[in-house]
């Protein structure tokens, strides 16, 4: 994920910053504890596409 692109992307719900998880190909919102998938290089930034992080999942 391009660092400049990541700087301008925010969580569509809380407008907070996102963290790129390369191993799972997801963008993580720490505030809402949501993971937005990246499919074919395109972030799926819809709440309906996001998954909730499990309590044991650590956000880096």
Swiss-Prot record:
<comment type="similarity">
    <text>Belongs to the UPF0434 family.</text>
</comment>
<dbReference type="InterPro" id="IPR005651">
    <property type="entry name" value="Trm112-like"/>
</dbReference>
<dbReference type="GO" id="GO:0005829">
    <property type="term" value="C:cytosol"/>
</dbReference>
<protein>
    <recommendedName>
        <fullName>UPF0434 protein CV_3345</fullName>
    </recommendedName>
</protein>
<dbReference type="Pfam" id="PF03966">
    <property type="entry name" value="Trm112p"/>
</dbReference>
